[in-house]
């Protein structure tokens, strides 16, 4: 039961951050917890998600990384925000190496948010490297260098990542449901996007 309790605590934290993310950046025009309610509903109807997975921790880091990326919007001193954003990207990529691919998207969005400068780029690079530097120190001290090499070796093994045949029917059903929700949300965002502020439209286009 310990892993389930930890898993539910992580889900509760993610739900709280979803509410704060919306309230902080006005992604939805009103203060709402609908996104958290839908998230909890999906978790509830999927018994397999009640256990603790690596992806739970990575998802929390992903959400915090988005928060700091959004905070960097049109900031003249954005190096600190991008440092923290890429720190959580780097930390998450240790557990899920393919997470590193998001770094490219994050840099493109930082450029679109007018927060990418040579200084902030160096801050982002240092933020991504810091978790690996800490991992290297641990691996070197305990003579377990394979632990440091493992994320880089797994980074290129993405063959099974897109293999839908290994998914169970309930997993495919959830993916289909999420796809429908994405299409409906995207159409609504395009149709009603002119009513939002420029900053909000930039956030929604990223999401």
Language-model segment annotations:
Residues 185-206:
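Membrane-interface helix-loop-helix junctions at transmembrane boundaries of multi-pass membrane enzymes
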Residues 65-80:
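Membrane-interface transmembrane helices that cradle and orient dolichyl/undecaprenyl
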Residues 1, 149-172:
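Juxtamembrane membrane-water interface segments that cap and precede transmembrane helices
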Residues 121-156:
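Membrane-lumen/periplasm interface segments of specific transmembrane helices
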């Amino acid at each position: 039961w310990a892993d389930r309790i930890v898993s539910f605590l992580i889900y509760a934290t993610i739900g709280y951050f979803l509410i704060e993310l919306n309230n902080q950046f006005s992604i939805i025009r009103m203060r709402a917890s609908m996104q958290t309610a839908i998230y909890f509903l999906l978790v509830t109807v999927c018994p397999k998600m009640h256990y603790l997975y690596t992806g739970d921790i990575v998802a929390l880091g992903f959400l915090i990384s988005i928060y700091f990326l959004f905070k960097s919007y049109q900031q003249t001193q954005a190096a600190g925000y991008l440092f923290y954003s890429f720190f959580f990207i780097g930390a998450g990529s240790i557990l899920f190496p393919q997470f590193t691919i998001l770094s490219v998207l994050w840099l493109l969005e930082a450029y679109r948010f007018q927060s990418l400068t040579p200084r902030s780029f160096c801050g982002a690079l240092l933020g991504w490297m810091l978790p690996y530097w800490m991992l290297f120190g641990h691996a070197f001290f305990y003579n377990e260098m394979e632990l440091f090499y493992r994320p880089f070796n797994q980074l290129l093994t993405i063959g099974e990542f897109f293999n839908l045949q290994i998914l169970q029917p309930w997993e495919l059903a959830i993916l289909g449901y999420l796809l429908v929700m994405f299409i409906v949300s995207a159409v609504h965002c395009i149709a009603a996007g002119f009513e939002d502020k420029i900053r909000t439209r930039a956030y929604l286009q990223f999401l």
